[in-house]
């Protein structure tokens, strides 16, 4: 099973991806996690990505497409995967179609989590408070300025993906404002 989760930052894509990974025994491919790992390890690509992420901008397609292509080719993705945070633009979606075709793969579903932007801001504030409460490290892209830029980038560049995937018959929407368990049940109903 090959799934894409769409939705604005803070919508719960990562949480739902982890639940799907456990339920269907498939790999979660979070470009955000892959990029953060590259930044922490201070790889060349990580250094490039850090500049964009900390400013709230999207990482250039050529960087992200290569990371995804390499990761999809790994053995744990043979039985399927969940893409969380990719694609973010129609250009990336078109590149993904080419990548999948070159590997004789196809998507099963694209699920968009629909959420209210004011609620997203509250979710991010809560996430920061929870991390601080346990002495954890706050994500650099969770500061208010970066988050506002990420929402703007999402509206301008990522929202057109809904139309792209709707036009090819893969898009399904789920109310992302429901509690985590209800969102999970709605996603599972789509997939089964």
Curated annotation (Swiss-Prot):
Q: Which InterPro entries does UniProt cross-reference here?
A: Adenylat/UMP-CMP_kin, Adenylat_kinase_CS, P-loop_NTPase
Q: Which UniProt keywords apply?
A: ATP-binding, Cytoplasm, Kinase, Nucleotide biosynthesis, Nucleotide-binding, Transferase
Q: State one molecular function term (GO).
A: adenylate kinase activity
Under the heading CDD domains, the entry gives: ADK (cd01428)
- What Pfam family does this protein match (any one)? ADK
Q: Which residues hold ATP?
A: 10-15, 127, 178
Region NMP, residue ranges: 30-59
Q: Which GO terms describe its biological process?
A: AMP salvage
Q: What is its EC number?
A: 2.7.4.3
Q: Where does AMP bind?
A: 31, 36, 57-59, 85-88, 92, 139, 150
UniProt pathway: Purine metabolism; AMP biosynthesis via salvage pathway; AMP from ADP: step 1/1
Q: Which reaction does it catalyse?
A: AMP + ATP = 2 ADP
Superkingdom of this entry's organism?
A: Bacteria
Entry's localization field = Cytoplasm
Q: What is known of its domains?
A: Consists of three domains, a large central CORE domain and two small peripheral domains, NMPbind and LID, which undergo movements during catalysis. The LID domain closes over the site of phosphoryl transfer upon ATP binding. Assembling and dissambling the active center during each catalytic cycle provides an effective means to prevent ATP hydrolysis.
Give the HAMAP family listed for this entry.
Adenylate_kinase_Adk
- Report the sequence similarity comment from the record: Belongs to the adenylate kinase family.
Q: What is this protein called?
A: Adenylate kinase
Organism of this sequence: Bartonella bacilliformis (strain ATCC 35685 / KC583 / Herrer 020/F12,63)
